[in-house]
């Protein structure tokens, strides 16, 4: 199943993309894709309901905005330096354990919304990432059981301001949490849609030029390891997002470095998770 949310900003409603590509409105049955939905077996219940009711659901036309495919979660947990070549281009050692940081949930936007380059920014960068949506409360889970706690997978551009992140004292969160810095979507793919999340091609283009082109098979820590590891330190709630890191090819690692500017267009995609596109504008 592919879950979407559509409509005006802060007024999004739940929908589904059917196997034939048709988008339908399921707001007569589902209130939102949130902690309550995921934590109460919402995906299974929605599937059962659709088997009897999908033909009566209104169609969502292509000119309707797609928002983030899930409501604001309790947290976004990110894994840093989870590809060896990206660690090298960042001038950092390959980690022996997952590097974790938070990203503000207020940074979430839709897959085709604009990226706003923050006030005072000169080093806003791109990062294509596979994100995991938690479907069942996870605390002290084993690697063997980790995937049982996953509701689905979603495309994420972990937009990052490198000066805020790396050149000022303190934690990375400052460079990761600006408004519009977490475009998610276009949809959440449930696990049955994704054969192996640890072997997916992912790519990113800047103004049509390929900047990142890799595979999650290059993970240092795979999905099972990451979910289990994080759950040893905090409880993951249904609807929470784990972003699993970016591969080689960010602007920071180029010689000379290259960063986003007003008018730039970023396109990104992951096998089975669709394509997103964001244009950039400066804060005003």
How would you name each of these model-derived features?
Residues 8, 94-111, 124-126, 261-272:
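Structural signature of FAD isoalloxazine-binding scaffolds in flavoprotein oxidoreductases
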Residues 138-142, 193-196:
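Short helix-loop capping/hinge motifs at secondary-structure junctions, enriched
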